[in-house]
Amino acid sequence: MTAIKTRPVHGYSKFLSTGSARGSRVVTNKEMCTLIDSTPEWIEQRTGITERRWATNSETVASMGTTAARTALERSGLEASQIDAIIVATVSHHRPSPSLAAYIARELGLGDAAAFDLNGACAGFCYSTALADSMIRTGSANYVLVIGVEKLSEMTNLDDRSTAFLFSDGAGAAIIGASDEPGIGPVVWGSRSDQLKTIELEDWPTASADPNKIHPLIRMEGRAVFKWAMTDVAKRAAEAIAEAGITPADLDVFIPHQANDRITDVVSRHLKLPESVTVCHDIADMGNTSAASVPIAIDRMLQRGQAHSGDLALIIGFGAGLVYAGQVIRLP
């Protein structure tokens, strides 16, 4: 029998650089309350959000993703031609084909790099990180560009006062490459498909049947999500730490999906994180950007000096599906 030839494998992978872009319009809680029946104080108390970013009409998922990716590429010192693959995590690309990754690859001049989108909802970036890690370690790629990007303001239901204030627009990107030492820990991922209706986006036929709708809208059962996050997500975060062979005290930074500050606090307490661990609260002036929240938070924490190159960080995303994915990484 003729054997199948395989490519040389790499030992490990790591994050090389990051970049981010945010919607240019700042929407404060006060302004939000002119659109919905609520108060700025109630929104902040329930979520930790004081303002969020909405993109303008000219700011698209393609343009924001390209901006974040270009920054990451410049910081990496690599040439565009060296990128072997681009993975874009998003639920906001309204054209099923071609992929958003293909559009961004064209803008960046990535040539014949493999390009595809991934729908992992709010866990999309962590899913994509796991794929990039596997691609590199199996020899399928040397450098992978991973992007999380969303324009959720288009899909926000302003008639739903329980969710309208949550969502935001932006993009985060990272370049992942081969490494001689472990830079990305084993992923802990999975789903609870019996909870499909807990968070969902309307299908296009339903949305298009309503003359008042331009895009499908988000529907979420907030209490059910909170209950799930308190139990299952907290458990999976602990598993990701254990899979990396470390303890909570070894962490420098905890960067969960920026869904709600109360969820972040509950998971942090469950993990028994010591005071030495910096916990990300990027949601305060960013809002919830689904697949973009983790990479945006990583980049902003690095740029603001809240985290540093070489730090050990636990990242975890969770959202519609219900899906989750998390791993320990070393920051670039």
From Swiss-Prot:
Q: Which GO terms describe its cellular component?
A: cytoplasm
The active-site annotation reads 122, 257, 288
List the residue ranges forming a coiled coil, or say none: none
| Record's subunit section | Homodimer.
Residues annotated as region ACP-binding? 258-262
Tell me the superkingdom of the source. Bacteria
Q: Where in the cell is it found?
A: Cytoplasm
Q: What is known of its domains?
A: The last Arg residue of the ACP-binding site is essential for the weak association between ACP/AcpP and FabH.
Q: Name one GO molecular function term.
A: 3-oxoacyl-[acyl-carrier-protein] synthase activity
Please give the SUPFAM superfamilies that the UniProt record associates with this protein. Answer: Thiolase-like
> Which Enzyme Commission number(s) are listed?
2.3.1.180, 2.3.1.300
**InterPro entries for this protein:** ACP_syn_III_C (IPR013747), ACP_syn_III_N (IPR013751), FabH (IPR004655), Thiolase-like (IPR016039)
The protein's name: Beta-ketoacyl-[acyl-carrier-protein] synthase III
According to UniProt, this protein's pathway is: Lipid metabolism; fatty acid biosynthesis
Q: What are the BP-aspect GO terms?
A: fatty acid biosynthetic process; secondary metabolite biosynthetic process
Catalytically driven reaction(s): butanoyl-CoA + malonyl-[ACP] + H(+) = 3-oxohexanoyl-[ACP] + CO2 + CoA; 2-methylpropanoyl-CoA + malonyl-[ACP] + H(+) = 4-methyl-3-oxopentanoyl-[ACP] + CO2 + CoA; hexanoyl-CoA + malonyl-[ACP] + H(+) = 3-oxooctanoyl-[ACP] + CO2 + CoA; octanoyl-CoA + malonyl-[ACP] + H(+) = 3-oxodecanoyl-[ACP] + CO2 + CoA
The role this protein plays is: Catalyzes the condensation reaction of fatty acid synthesis by the addition to an acyl acceptor of two carbons from malonyl-ACP. Catalyzes the first condensation reaction which initiates fatty acid synthesis and may therefore play a role in governing the total rate of fatty acid production. Possesses both acetoacetyl-ACP synthase and acetyl transacylase activities. Exhibits relatively broad substrate specificity regarding the chain lengths of acyl-CoA, and can use branched-short chain CoAs. Can use butyryl-, isobutyryl-, and hexanoyl-CoA as preferred substrates over acetyl-CoA.
| Family (UniProt) | Belongs to the thiolase-like superfamily. FabH family.
Which keywords has UniProt assigned to this entry?
Acyltransferase, Cytoplasm, Fatty acid biosynthesis, Fatty acid metabolism, Lipid biosynthesis, Lipid metabolism, Multifunctional enzyme, Transferase
